[in-house]
Protein backbone atom coordinates (compact mmCIF):
# COMPACT_ATOMS: atom_id res chain seq x y z
CA UNK A 1 0.00 0.00 0.00
CA UNK A 2 1.01 3.58 -0.64
CA UNK A 3 -0.05 6.35 1.76
CA UNK A 4 0.49 10.05 1.08
CA UNK A 5 -0.27 12.77 3.59
CA UNK A 6 -0.74 16.43 2.63
CA UNK A 7 0.11 18.71 5.55
CA UNK A 8 1.58 22.17 6.14
CA UNK A 9 3.16 20.70 9.28
CA UNK A 10 5.09 17.64 8.02
CA UNK A 11 6.94 17.29 11.32
CA UNK A 12 3.60 16.49 12.98
CA UNK A 13 3.63 13.14 11.19
CA UNK A 14 7.03 12.02 12.50
CA UNK A 15 5.48 9.56 15.01
CA UNK A 16 4.68 7.41 11.98
CA UNK A 17 8.39 6.56 11.98
CA UNK A 18 7.93 4.61 15.19
CA UNK A 19 6.91 1.10 16.16
CA UNK A 20 5.14 -1.24 13.75
CA UNK A 21 4.33 1.37 11.10
CA UNK A 22 7.94 2.50 10.88
CA UNK A 23 9.07 -1.11 10.64
CA UNK A 24 6.51 -1.82 7.91
CA UNK A 25 7.91 1.07 5.87
CA UNK A 26 11.49 -0.08 6.43
CA UNK A 27 10.54 -3.62 5.40
CA UNK A 28 8.86 -2.39 2.22
CA UNK A 29 5.37 -3.48 3.24
CA UNK A 30 4.19 0.12 3.20
CA UNK A 31 5.21 3.28 1.34
CA UNK A 32 4.54 6.43 3.34
CA UNK A 33 5.26 10.00 2.25
CA UNK A 34 4.37 13.49 3.48
CA UNK A 35 3.93 16.43 1.09
CA UNK A 36 3.76 20.09 2.14
CA UNK A 37 1.34 22.22 0.07
CA UNK A 38 3.54 25.24 0.87
CA UNK A 39 6.05 23.79 -1.60
CA UNK A 40 3.50 24.47 -4.35
CA UNK A 41 2.92 28.17 -3.66
CA UNK A 42 4.16 31.00 -5.89
CA UNK A 43 4.72 33.90 -3.46
CA UNK A 44 7.70 34.52 -1.20
CA UNK A 45 5.57 34.07 1.92
CA UNK A 46 4.43 30.61 0.77
CA UNK A 47 0.82 31.53 1.50
CA UNK A 48 -1.64 28.65 1.73
CA UNK A 49 -4.63 30.40 3.34
CA UNK A 50 -6.83 33.48 2.96
CA UNK A 51 -9.92 35.11 4.47
CA UNK A 52 -13.30 33.42 3.89
CA UNK A 53 -15.81 34.76 1.37
CA UNK A 54 -18.99 35.83 3.12
CA UNK A 55 -17.11 36.91 6.21
CA UNK A 56 -16.60 35.04 9.43
CA UNK A 57 -13.74 34.17 11.74
CA UNK A 58 -10.63 32.24 10.82
CA UNK A 59 -8.83 31.50 7.59
CA UNK A 60 -9.53 29.06 4.76
CA UNK A 61 -6.93 26.94 2.97
CA UNK A 62 -6.50 28.04 -0.66
CA UNK A 63 -7.44 25.45 -3.31
CA UNK A 64 -4.51 25.87 -5.72
CA UNK A 65 -1.56 24.78 -3.52
CA UNK A 66 -3.55 21.83 -2.21
CA UNK A 67 -4.61 20.78 -5.70
CA UNK A 68 -1.05 20.97 -7.01
CA UNK A 69 0.15 18.91 -4.05
CA UNK A 70 -2.60 16.35 -4.65
CA UNK A 71 -1.78 16.14 -8.35
CA UNK A 72 1.87 15.48 -7.55
CA UNK A 73 1.18 12.53 -5.24
CA UNK A 74 -1.44 11.03 -7.58
CA UNK A 75 1.07 11.16 -10.43
CA UNK A 76 3.76 9.67 -8.19
CA UNK A 77 1.42 6.86 -7.19
CA UNK A 78 0.44 6.18 -10.78
CA UNK A 79 4.07 6.13 -11.92
CA UNK A 80 4.97 3.75 -9.09
CA UNK A 81 2.10 1.41 -10.00
CA UNK A 82 3.09 1.44 -13.67
CA UNK A 83 6.70 0.77 -12.75
CA UNK A 84 5.63 -2.12 -10.54
CA UNK A 85 3.60 -3.63 -13.38
CA UNK A 86 6.56 -3.26 -15.72
CA UNK A 87 8.88 -5.02 -13.28
CA UNK A 88 6.53 -7.98 -13.01
CA UNK A 89 6.09 -8.37 -16.78
CA UNK A 90 7.85 -11.49 -18.19
CA UNK A 91 10.07 -9.54 -20.58
CA UNK A 92 11.20 -6.98 -18.02
CA UNK A 93 14.39 -7.46 -15.97
CA UNK A 94 13.92 -7.66 -12.21
CA UNK A 95 14.75 -4.37 -10.50
CA UNK A 96 16.85 -4.44 -7.33
CA UNK A 97 14.99 -3.75 -4.09
CA UNK A 98 15.72 -0.47 -2.37
CA UNK A 99 15.07 0.58 1.19
CA UNK A 100 12.29 3.09 1.73
CA UNK A 101 12.83 5.76 4.40
CA UNK A 102 10.23 5.79 7.17
CA UNK A 103 8.57 9.10 6.31
CA UNK A 104 9.53 10.71 3.03
CA UNK A 105 8.99 14.39 2.35
CA UNK A 106 8.02 14.76 -1.28
CA UNK A 107 9.82 17.42 -3.32
CA UNK A 108 7.89 20.27 -4.86
CA UNK A 109 6.63 20.17 -8.41
CA UNK A 110 9.27 20.16 -11.14
CA UNK A 111 7.45 22.76 -13.24
CA UNK A 112 8.13 26.44 -12.77
CA UNK A 113 5.94 28.15 -10.14
CA UNK A 114 2.87 29.65 -11.73
CA UNK A 115 3.15 27.56 -14.88
CA UNK A 116 -0.06 26.23 -16.35
CA UNK A 117 -0.92 22.72 -15.24
CA UNK A 118 -3.19 20.22 -16.94
CA UNK A 119 -5.72 18.05 -15.16
CA UNK A 120 -3.99 15.00 -13.75
CA UNK A 121 -5.05 11.46 -14.62
CA UNK A 122 -4.97 8.26 -12.64
CA UNK A 123 -2.54 5.61 -13.82
CA UNK A 124 -4.31 2.91 -15.83
CA UNK A 125 -2.55 0.17 -13.87
CA UNK A 126 -4.31 0.91 -10.58
CA UNK A 127 -7.67 1.96 -9.21
CA UNK A 128 -8.27 5.61 -8.44
CA UNK A 129 -6.74 6.60 -5.09
CA UNK A 130 -8.94 7.39 -2.12
CA UNK A 131 -8.63 10.93 -0.76
CA UNK A 132 -9.52 11.03 2.94
CA UNK A 133 -10.38 14.50 4.23
CA UNK A 134 -10.53 14.60 8.05
CA UNK A 135 -13.42 16.85 9.01
CA UNK A 136 -15.96 17.18 11.84
CA UNK A 137 -18.51 17.26 9.02
CA UNK A 138 -17.46 13.83 7.73
CA UNK A 139 -18.73 10.30 8.26
CA UNK A 140 -17.63 8.87 11.62
CA UNK A 141 -14.51 6.71 11.24
CA UNK A 142 -15.09 3.14 12.45
CA UNK A 143 -13.30 -0.19 12.46
CA UNK A 144 -15.42 -1.22 9.48
CA UNK A 145 -14.15 1.77 7.52
CA UNK A 146 -10.59 0.96 8.62
CA UNK A 147 -10.96 -2.48 7.02
CA UNK A 148 -12.35 -0.92 3.84
CA UNK A 149 -9.43 1.50 3.55
CA UNK A 150 -6.91 -1.25 4.31
CA UNK A 151 -8.03 -2.99 1.11
CA UNK A 152 -7.08 0.02 -1.04
CA UNK A 153 -3.83 0.38 -2.99
CA UNK A 154 -3.32 4.12 -2.54
CA UNK A 155 -4.64 6.39 0.23
CA UNK A 156 -4.15 10.15 0.37
CA UNK A 157 -4.93 12.18 3.51
CA UNK A 158 -5.45 15.95 3.32
CA UNK A 159 -4.83 17.55 6.73
CA UNK A 160 -6.83 20.76 6.70
CA UNK A 161 -6.18 23.59 9.16
CA UNK A 162 -8.01 26.63 10.46
CA UNK A 163 -11.56 26.72 9.02
CA UNK A 164 -10.83 23.96 6.52
CA UNK A 165 -9.93 23.71 2.83
CA UNK A 166 -11.78 25.60 0.09
CA UNK A 167 -14.65 23.34 -1.00
CA UNK A 168 -13.59 23.71 -4.64
CA UNK A 169 -10.48 21.67 -3.87
CA UNK A 170 -12.70 18.78 -2.82
CA UNK A 171 -15.11 19.23 -5.75
CA UNK A 172 -12.23 19.26 -8.23
CA UNK A 173 -10.58 16.25 -6.61
CA UNK A 174 -13.75 14.20 -7.10
CA UNK A 175 -13.17 14.27 -10.85
CA UNK A 176 -10.01 12.20 -10.45
CA UNK A 177 -10.01 10.45 -7.05
CA UNK A 178 -12.55 8.96 -4.68
CA UNK A 179 -13.13 11.50 -1.90
CA UNK A 180 -14.11 10.35 1.58
CA UNK A 181 -14.61 12.96 4.34
CA UNK A 182 -14.14 11.23 7.71
CA UNK A 183 -14.43 12.34 11.33
CA UNK A 184 -12.92 10.83 14.47
CA UNK A 185 -15.94 11.90 16.49
CA UNK A 186 -18.21 14.71 17.55
CA UNK A 187 -15.51 17.17 18.56
CA UNK A 188 -13.18 19.65 16.86
CA UNK A 189 -9.37 19.53 16.61
CA UNK A 190 -6.93 22.25 15.55
CA UNK A 191 -6.08 20.37 12.37
CA UNK A 192 -6.32 17.07 10.57
CA UNK A 193 -2.91 15.72 11.58
CA UNK A 194 -4.04 14.15 14.86
CA UNK A 195 -6.95 12.47 13.10
CA UNK A 196 -4.65 11.20 10.35
CA UNK A 197 -2.24 9.69 12.87
CA UNK A 198 -5.12 7.74 14.37
CA UNK A 199 -6.60 6.69 11.03
CA UNK A 200 -3.28 5.65 9.50
CA UNK A 201 -2.47 3.49 12.51
CA UNK A 202 -5.94 1.92 12.52
CA UNK A 203 -5.70 1.14 8.80
CA UNK A 204 -2.09 0.03 8.43
CA UNK A 205 -2.19 -2.45 11.32
CA UNK A 206 -4.78 -4.39 9.27
CA UNK A 207 -2.38 -4.81 6.34
CA UNK A 208 -0.88 -8.32 6.21
CA UNK A 209 2.70 -8.26 7.46
CA UNK A 210 2.34 -5.25 9.76
CA UNK A 211 1.08 -7.04 12.89
CA UNK A 212 3.28 -9.92 14.01
CA UNK A 213 0.38 -12.10 15.20
CA UNK A 214 -2.63 -11.77 12.87
CA UNK A 215 -4.80 -13.71 15.34
CA UNK A 216 -4.73 -10.72 17.69
CA UNK A 217 -6.83 -8.77 15.17
CA UNK A 218 -9.67 -11.28 15.46
CA UNK A 219 -10.13 -10.71 19.21
CA UNK A 220 -9.98 -6.92 19.41
CA UNK A 221 -12.68 -4.45 20.35
CA UNK A 222 -15.19 -3.78 17.53
CA UNK A 223 -14.30 -7.04 15.79
CA UNK A 224 -17.62 -8.85 15.46
CA UNK A 225 -19.47 -5.78 16.70
CA UNK A 226 -18.44 -6.12 20.36
CA UNK A 227 -15.90 -4.61 22.72
CA UNK A 228 -12.93 -6.72 23.78
CA UNK A 229 -13.02 -8.82 26.95
CA UNK A 230 -10.79 -7.98 29.97
CA UNK A 231 -7.22 -9.31 29.80
CA UNK A 232 -4.82 -10.36 32.58
CA UNK A 233 -1.18 -11.42 32.96
CA UNK A 234 1.17 -12.61 35.72
CA UNK A 235 1.15 -12.58 38.71
CA UNK A 236 -2.05 -14.49 39.40
CA UNK A 237 -2.61 -12.39 42.53
CA UNK A 238 -1.61 -8.73 42.62
CA UNK A 239 -2.32 -6.45 45.58
CA UNK A 240 -4.91 -8.94 46.80
CA UNK A 241 -6.67 -8.88 43.44
CA UNK A 242 -6.83 -12.30 41.78
CA UNK A 243 -7.14 -13.22 38.13
CA UNK A 244 -10.57 -14.80 37.44
CA UNK A 245 -10.27 -18.47 38.30
CA UNK A 246 -11.72 -19.60 34.99
CA UNK A 247 -8.65 -18.24 33.16
CA UNK A 248 -6.40 -20.49 35.22
CA UNK A 249 -8.48 -23.63 34.60
CA UNK A 250 -6.97 -24.58 31.26
CA UNK A 251 -10.47 -25.44 30.01
CA UNK A 252 -10.48 -23.73 26.61
CA UNK A 253 -14.21 -24.09 26.01
CA UNK A 254 -15.14 -22.51 29.33
CA UNK A 255 -12.57 -19.75 28.84
CA UNK A 256 -13.97 -18.97 25.40
CA UNK A 257 -17.52 -18.77 26.84
CA UNK A 258 -16.37 -16.55 29.72
CA UNK A 259 -14.67 -14.17 27.31
CA UNK A 260 -17.75 -14.04 25.10
CA UNK A 261 -19.94 -13.28 28.13
CA UNK A 262 -17.57 -10.51 29.18
CA UNK A 263 -17.70 -8.99 25.70
CA UNK A 264 -21.48 -8.97 25.70
CA UNK A 265 -21.90 -7.54 29.20
CA UNK A 266 -19.17 -4.92 28.74
CA UNK A 267 -20.59 -3.79 25.40
CA UNK A 268 -24.12 -3.61 26.83
CA UNK A 269 -22.90 -1.45 29.69
CA UNK A 270 -20.53 0.87 27.81
CA UNK A 271 -21.86 0.90 24.24
CA UNK A 272 -25.54 -0.10 24.18
CA UNK A 273 -25.75 1.28 20.65
CA UNK A 274 -23.49 -1.55 19.50
CA UNK A 275 -25.82 -4.15 21.00
CA UNK A 276 -28.73 -2.56 19.15
CA UNK A 277 -26.78 -2.95 15.90
CA UNK A 278 -26.40 -6.73 16.38
CA UNK A 279 -28.60 -9.16 14.47
CA UNK A 280 -30.43 -11.15 17.20
CA UNK A 281 -30.71 -14.17 14.90
CA UNK A 282 -26.91 -14.49 14.92
CA UNK A 283 -26.76 -14.85 18.72
CA UNK A 284 -27.09 -18.15 20.57
CA UNK A 285 -29.14 -18.82 23.69
CA UNK A 286 -26.21 -18.19 26.00
CA UNK A 287 -25.60 -14.81 24.34
CA UNK A 288 -29.24 -13.81 24.73
CA UNK A 289 -29.26 -14.91 28.36
CA UNK A 290 -26.28 -12.69 29.15
CA UNK A 291 -27.88 -9.73 27.40
CA UNK A 292 -31.18 -10.33 29.20
CA UNK A 293 -29.32 -9.85 32.49
CA UNK A 294 -28.20 -6.43 31.24
CA UNK A 295 -31.73 -5.43 30.24
CA UNK A 296 -31.72 -6.33 26.54
CA UNK A 297 -34.48 -8.60 25.23
CA UNK A 298 -35.64 -9.73 21.79
CA UNK A 299 -39.34 -9.44 20.99
CA UNK A 300 -40.63 -10.20 17.52
CA UNK A 301 -37.12 -10.07 16.11
CA UNK A 302 -36.42 -6.59 17.52
CA UNK A 303 -34.46 -5.42 20.52
CA UNK A 304 -36.23 -4.08 23.60
CA UNK A 305 -34.77 -2.56 26.73
CA UNK A 306 -36.07 -2.98 30.27
CA UNK A 307 -38.68 -0.30 30.84
CA UNK A 308 -41.11 -1.51 28.20
CA UNK A 309 -40.03 0.67 25.30
CA UNK A 310 -38.63 -0.40 21.96
CA UNK A 311 -34.98 0.26 21.25
CA UNK A 312 -33.75 0.87 17.72
CA UNK A 313 -30.27 1.39 16.32
CA UNK A 314 -31.11 4.89 15.17
CA UNK A 315 -32.38 6.01 18.57
CA UNK A 316 -30.40 4.11 21.21
CA UNK A 317 -31.51 4.36 24.80
CA UNK A 318 -28.24 5.47 26.33
CA UNK A 319 -28.71 4.50 29.96
Question: Which stretches of residues belong to each language-model region?
Answer:
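S-adenosyl-L-methionine/SAH cofactor-binding core of RNA-modifying enzymes
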Residues: 62-161, 208
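Conserved RecA-like P-loop NTPase ATPase core
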Residues: 56, 160, 251
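N-terminal nucleotide/polyanion-binding subdomain common to many enzyme families
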Residues: 1-76, 80, 104-107, 254-268, ...
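Hydrophobic/aromatic beta-strand patches that form the interior of the parallel beta-sheet core
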Residues: 4-6, 33-35, 132, 155-157, ...
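Short, hydrophobic/aliphatic alpha-helical segments
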Residues: 36-47, 143-149, 174-175
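Surface-exposed, charge/polar-rich loops and edge strands
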Residues: 182, 205-209, 214-246, 257, ...
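Structured adenosyl-cofactor binding patch, chiefly the S-adenosyl-L-methionine
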Residues: 165, 169-222
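SAM-dependent methyltransferases
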Residues: 1, 84-85, 90, 101-106, ...
